[in-house]
Amino acid sequence: MDEIQKQLDKSDQLMQKACTHTQIEFSKIRAGRAMPDMLDGISILYYNAMTPLNQVAAITTPDARTLVIKPWERKCIQEIEKAIVNSKLGLNPQNDGEVVRIIVPPLTEERRKDLVKQAKNEAEKGKISIRNIRKDIKETFKHLQKDGASEDTIKRAEEKLQNLTDKHIHNIDNLLTHKEAEILEV
């Protein structure tokens, strides 16, 4: 049935979005080396609007442990520094009037374990999201069966849906494995 295929395609797209969201959340978990995307969640008040940091400054990494933030306008430096201090990243910015420098401290063993736990929580959220999508689509299949779709057709569709679910959960597991390795790398 055409409607069943539409639902399977829809579920695949939604599950892919859940995987992408999980990957974005993983990128926010710092892994001991300086990366510009560590600061993606930080916004500052810029001309009376909350603006992402990467839209008001150039963020570079001159070496593995240093981030340099060069704002387009000098007047933003104090605001940038304050936003970084107030973020939950545990970073200490240093302002020299021209740029804001952040030395990323090496991670302690305890902090690494906390970050792995945080990554596992994000992975679990992604898996739950995928399972909820599966549940919603299965409900749609039940309604289609009541509307006249054959039981065999619905069973085959549910098998395909389960395969999609397994594929995307496996994808999240792979992302988690890579993130754990990145975090635990000394």
Curated annotation (Swiss-Prot):
InterPro entries: Ribosome_recyc_fac (IPR002661), Ribosome_recyc_fac_dom (IPR023584), RRF_sf (IPR036191). It is found in: Cytoplasm. Disulfide bonds: none annotated. GO terms for cellular component: cytoplasm. It comes from the Bacteria. Gene3D superfamilies: 3.30.1360.40, Ribosome-recycling factor. GO terms for molecular function: ribosomal large subunit binding. Keywords: Cytoplasm, Protein biosynthesis. One of its GO terms (biological process) is translational termination. Pfam families: RRF. HAMAP family: RRF. PANTHER family: MITOCHONDRIAL RIBOSOME RECYCLING FACTOR PSEUDO 1, RIBOSOME RECYCLING FACTOR. NCBIfam families: frr. Responsible for the release of ribosomes from messenger RNA at the termination of protein biosynthesis. May increase the efficiency of translation by recycling ribosomes from one round of translation to another. Belongs to the RRF family. This is Ribosome-recycling factor. It comes from Amoebophilus asiaticus (strain 5a2). The gene is frr.
